[in-house]
Design a protein with these regions (language model features):
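Active-site neighborhood of phospho(di)ester-bond hydrolases with catalytic His/Asp-centered motifs
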Residues: 62-64, 86-94, 114-117, 178-182, ...
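FMN-binding flavodoxin-like domain, especially the glycine-rich phosphate-binding loop
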Residues: 190-230, 234-237, 257, 279-292, ...
Length: 401
């Protein structure tokens, strides 16, 4: 069993709330208008912007949603409150998909005390210069600090650079729930059924992947807590089998491959480099190797990057173009190195008609990367594959086997 999660079907959630526990309710929204999350990540199944309410002697609302959905979210909040007023608005993360509805919320509920980190309040002032939160309506959450609601106690855990500087997570002790900010999130709206891991990996590697050391620090803090449920700001509520999710985050944040396999990423203008990549992929597949092939000019680059982190071996088949790398290959490698790609075996296939330089340039781009082991087999194609190149590809397949 890969996962156990609470998903929210539109028929169950539209205009109403969902119960997480007797006293904790989901009041988030689904976004099927967005095509590119953060202006770059394809999200064919939309996005979820999650928000929660803790009902007790005092009421805490956990985070807001994207501003385009402020009114829908406020309706959800109002239904759960059932005539009561919120005492606290806890802001764990100031990225606009979670904070942009703060002004609308405070206009509706002006007596609410806002709880955030000191840096969170700084960012609030930057994002929303039009609102002024009085000092008595601000509560700066200390690292390790608590907030008593009645039978529920919120414990604040700073999580800087996971993936913004102001981020904190919140542990609710009585229900044993970790409100994890963007941690353990995924792409996709909650009214679309899909496995967690692939879109969570693509989300993590793309958005959080650079900050492995910071995630490791948070995981060490989490290990001291009795966590029975994880409530992220994106994706489903996670429960049961939490070891699966924690193990994935440990792998991803320590830059260790999840499994053995080969990603072959190629850039080809006239199809000759593509033929070499396909030839190698066929050889590897027939030998029993898990092999994934990406045309970098046409694929979802975020998926190609995520798979490079998933598997333990990477083949880059590139061409020389204007005395440099073909642009999509350069962009792909930059996407890897800026996310601290490491602990992998890498092979290079270059193609050039008169002055092939791709191999040298590719290797140079990994100079500062940790524990990148290049294969012994080096392949240079002059325009199109010949018999010698096929023999070299056979040798490379054996070396990668």
């Amino acid at each position: 069993m890969e996962r156990s999660a609470i998903n929210i079907k539109q028929s169950e959630r539209k205009g109403i709330h969902m119960e997480i526990t007797n006293n904790i309710k989901y009041v988030g929204v689904n976004d099927h208008q967005v095509d590119l999350f953060e202006g770059q990540y394809q999200v064919p199944n939309g996005m979820a912007y999650n928000s929660y309410i803790i009902l007790d002697e005092k009421i805490a609302v956990m985070d807001t949603v994207d501003g385009a959905f402020a009114e829908e979210w406020l309706q959800n909040v109002e239904q759960v409150l059932a005539g009561r007023k919120p005492d606290y608005l806890v802001i764990q993360h100031m990225e606009p998909d979670h904070s942009a509805s703060i002004p609308a919320f405070l206009q509706r509920y002006p007596e609410t005390v806002v709880v955030s980190t000191a840096m969170g309040f700084k960012y609030m002032e930057q994002f929303f210069p039009e609102i002024e939160i009085a000092s008595e309506k601000r509560s700066v959450a200390a690292n390790g600090g608590t907030l008593e609601l009645g039978s529920h106690t919120l414990h604040f855990v700073y999580a800087p650079m996971v993936h913004w500087p102001e981020v904190m997570m919140t542990y609710e002790a009585s229900e044993k729930i970790l409100f994890a900010a963007d941690g353990f999130g995924k792409f996709g709206a909650l009214d679309v059924e899909e496995d967690w891991v692939d879109e969570a990996r693509r989300y993590y590697i793309g958005i959080v992947g650079k900050y492995g050391a910071q995630v490791q620090a948070v995981l060490k803090k989490a290990a001291t807590l009795d966590i029975q449920m994880i409530c992220s700001l994106h994706g489903p509520v996670l429960k049961d089998n939490l070891g699966f999710y924690l193990e994935k985050y440990d792998k991803w944040s320590s830059y260790q491959p999840e499994e053995s396999g080969v990603v072959i990423a190629y850039a080809s203008v006239y199809g000759n480099t593509k033929k070499a990549a396909q030839y190698l992929a066929d050889k590897l597949s027939k030998s029993g190797q898990k092999t994934v092939l990406y045309d970098l000019a046409r694929c979802d680059k975020a998926a190609a990057i995520a798979d490079a982190f998933r598997y333990d071996k990477l083949v880059l088949a590139g061409i020389t173009y204007n005395g440099d790398l073909f642009p999509c290959m350069r962009a792909y490698i930059e996407g890897l190195t800026e996310r601290s790609y490491q602990n992998r075996r890498v092979a290079v296939i270059e193609n050039g008609t008169w002055a092939p330089m791709a191999a040298k340039l590719i290797r140079g781009m990994f100079e500062k990367s940790k524990d990148i082991a290049f294969t012994d087999t080096n392949i240079t194609i002059k325009s199109a594959m010949n018999a010698q190149n096929r023999a070299e590809l056979d040798k490379l397949a054996a070396e990668l086997g």
